Every structure is written in C-alpha cells, then in structure tokens.
UniProtKB/Swiss-Prot annotation:
One of its GO terms (molecular function) is phosphatidylinositol binding. The gene is snx31. May be involved in protein trafficking. This is Sorting nexin-31. One of its GO terms (biological process) is protein transport. Pfam families: PX (PF00787), SNX17-27-31_F1_FERM (PF21273), SNX17-31_F2_FERM (PF21271), SNX17_FERM_C (PF18116). It comes from Xenopus tropicalis (Western clawed frog). It comes from the Eukaryota.
C-alpha cells in the first residue's frame, strides 16, 4: 500500500484560527483528510498499545511555520503514515480500524446507514449485501464470501478490487481495496457508474490454486476469473491449447479448464495495457504481464522495433511510483498521471526503465505481493519502495455518479486546496 499527501488545504476554525488540512491518498485515491493535531492525539493513544513498534511522529513547531517547514511536515506525516499502513499488526488492530473508519466517514460527511451493496464477480454477476456505509472492506469481503459459500478460512486468498468496464471498451483492474478502507465510500467517490467492486483472487503465484481445490465454491470463483482472463486475451495459449479450452467451455468442465489453464502462458498474471515507456526509446508502447515471480514487458518503439524483456522478481533492485498531477487539473482517479520507475540487474550492469500507466500503484502492489510470497527471500521485503508526488494547488471533490445512492444530498461544499505559509503550529 502506498500513502501520499499531494495537497494541503488552509482553513479557519470557528474561532478564526488557521489550520492545515492534509489530504491523505491511498494508492491514488482520496482516503481521508486530517489535521496534524488530530493525528498527534491519535498517535499518543496508539503508542500506549504498540509502543516503540510505531515510527517516530513528526515533532511540533512552536514558532510560525514557513512554506518550507510546512512542506517538510507534509513529507514527515506521509512517511509516518506509510510506515503505519505497512505494518499488518497495526492495521488489523481495533484502535487503527476505528480511527480510520471515523476519518473516512467524517471526510465525506457520510452518516452510518444501511444499504444494499453490489459485489460483482468476474463474469458480471453480482451478489447483493445488506451492509452499512461504515463497514470495512474486510467485513464486506467476509460477507460476500459467506454469501458465495466460500469458507472463512479461504478468505486470505481473495480480496476486493475496484474494476472498470467501458460499454465497448477494455476491462481494467484499477486497484485493490485495503482491508481498512470503506468500500462504499471508495466506489461512491468515483465519477461514473462504470466502476464497480469485484471479488477476485489475490495471489500472484498460480500454484496457490491448489489451496482452493477442496472447495467447490472457491473453484467456481477461480473458474470465472480464468474464463475472463482467457476471453479477454490476457493469456497467450497455443492454437492447440485454445481449441482444448474452447471445448472445456462448451462442456462446462471447470476442473479440466483450470487444469489446462495452468499450462497456458501468463495464466494468473495481471495484464496491463495502454502503457508507454522510455525504453528502448521515448514514447514506446509496452504491454506488461506480472505474476509467478516475474514481470514480462513487450516493448514496441515508434520506429517499429519490438523487444521482449522478462525479469525475475529477484532481478529487480528497487522501484518507485510517482504521482504527477497536471497543473489546473482536478485531482481524481480519472485524471492521474502515474509512472513506475524500476532498476534491475542485467549481468554486471544496473539499468533503469520508466513506465507510464494509470495502473502503476496496482503494478507496484503486485510486485510487493510477489515478494511476500517468496518466504526464502523475505529479506527483500525491506526493499525501498518510495512514492513521490508533486504538491499542487487544485480542487479535489467527489463527483456525482449515482452508482448506489444519490450523492448530492450528502455532499457539502468543498473548499479549494492551497499550499500554506507562515502558520503557527499552535493553530494546527
């Protein structure tokens, strides 16, 4: 998971005192807005539970802050929150879940109400869940799997995702919803009804399919996703494999279909298209598959040159995701300019490639997931994964989409964001 605070907002309280509101983004999506003093108070509370397990909290300033000091604090808070959300022990605790639930609900002025939330499957079918607006993704996933008949013990192999399907366009996996996020707010804050919440498997090693073969209901989910990958041409079967797979589809032989898919190139990989790269030359198109401990990149340069690059996860030295919003542009998941830059070892030399894709955060999450699935190489999980971003003056506001409810009645006026200068810490 990647935390960033790309924008800040200067406001006044009821007494006329100025303070700074920090907009916290999780993998490119607005998670919450929070004041320094509120985070400081919460840090004191959570410190009583976890002690020195927590990162150091940014110190107070008792003199007026300059613009440079304000930016330094923004970066420090960002680093603090990044370390917090990277600790599964902390993020699964009640004190963490309750606080971030409150932050999200307060940020979007959302009351706790009952509603019917649709959770989709890869074939487009949906289950309807009776949930609350304040239910976490962890809770919603449990409810969805229960309704689908999948045992709770197998829940770790699945997750909720935001996906996007255009009427006559491609299907895209946009992001994984973290366990402490509120799925209704995540989908509610998007701009159109082509976004949806989908339950999908969450592991990068296809051999983990074997862990689900004892559950008929889990096999059904695997089958639906495998069929989707096959029909979307995310995999690359040979002609013989394609004929056999088509026959299995006609016969609705799920186990045989899954068995054959295991032999197909790129089965179980995340497929990313519509990317550009600076390799082998600027503005080269690139198609990416990531999974099974590797990242495969197919480059097509403007001059007609094609090149394939397959990198083992152990060959990657480091990577970082950069969020580059354009000036005077609304900052939203539909208007992101992301790049993923990675360094890799080729022989005795170190090389660097930059890829521009709106799925950069998801790609980064998949790379990290592959590391976590390699217990022999657990030390590589300490690999530095940075998220850089450009601070900008822009508006960030949810747009009405009408996916699950009428939003306008629940929305309040949004204020413009701005970089602050000369604000005393006593006001924060």
């Amino acid at each position: 998971m990647h935390i960033c605070i790309p924008v800040t907002e200067e406001l006044q309280d009821t007494l006329g005192c100025r303070f700074v509101l920090y907009s916290v983004y999780l993998e490119g999506f607005l998670l919450c807005k929070v004041r320094y003093k509120d985070l400081h108070l919460w840090n004191e509370q959570i410190y009583r539970v976890f002690g020195n397990r927590l990162p150091k909290f940014p110190p107070k300033y008792y003199l007026a802050m300059t613009k440079a000091m304000t930016n330094e604090r923004r970066l420090q808070l960002e680093q603090y929150l990044q370390q917090i959300v990277s600790d599964p022990v902390v993020t699964s605790s009640e004190i963490f879940m309750e606080y971030f639930k409150k932050l999200q609900m307060d940020t979007f002025n959302m009351p706790t109400v009952q509603l019917i939330l649709r959770i989709y499957m890869p074939d487009g079918a949906a289950v309807e869940l009776d949930v609350q607006t304040s239910d976490s993704a962890e809770r919603v996933l449990e409810a969805a799997l229960f309704k689908l008949g999948v045992s709770r013990e197998l829940g770790e192999y699945f997750s909720l995702f935001i996906t996007h399907k255009e009427a006559k366009g491609p299907f895209t996996v946009v992001k994984r919803i973290a366990g402490f996020e509120l799925p209704f707010l995540t989908i509610w804050n998007l701009e159109d009804d082509q976004f949806q919440i989908e339950v999908r498997k969450w592991y990068m090693n296809p051999s983990n399919d074997a862990m689900l073969m004892g559950s008929t209901e889990a096999i059904d989910l695997l089958y639906l996703q495998a069929v989707q990958e096959f029909q979307m041409e995310w995999t690359r079967p040979t002609k013989d494999q394609q004929q056999k797979l088509q026959h299995c589809l006609k016969q609705q032989n799920k186990l045989k279909f899954l068995e054959l898919m295991k032999t197909v190139e790129y089965y179980g990989y995340l497929h990313i298209t519509s990317c550009t790269s600076d390799y082998p030359e600027c503005d080269s198109e690139v198609t990416i598959w990531v999974g099974n401990n590797e990242m495969s990149c197919h480059f097509y340069s403007p001059g007609g040159h094609a090149e394939n690059l397959r990198l083992s996860i152990k060959d990657l030295i480091c990577w970082n995701v950069t969020l580059l919003p354009k000036k005077q542009e609304v900052m939203s998941p539909n208007h992101q300019h992301l790049e993923l830059k990675f360094d890799y070892q080729q022989g005795s030399s170190l090389k660097c490639i930059t890829i521009h894709t709106e799925q950069a955060f998801l790609l980064s999450s998949c790379l990290k997931k592959m590391l976590s699935e390699r217990p022999v190489h657990r030390c590589k999980e300490e690999l530095e994964i940075q998220v850089d971003k450009a601070t900008c003056k822009s508006n960030i506001r949810p747009e009405q989409n009408g996916v699950h409810a009428k939003k306008q009645a629940l929305l309040k006026d949004k204020r413009e964001y701005c970089v602050v200068d000369n604000i005393s810490d006593l006001d924060l």
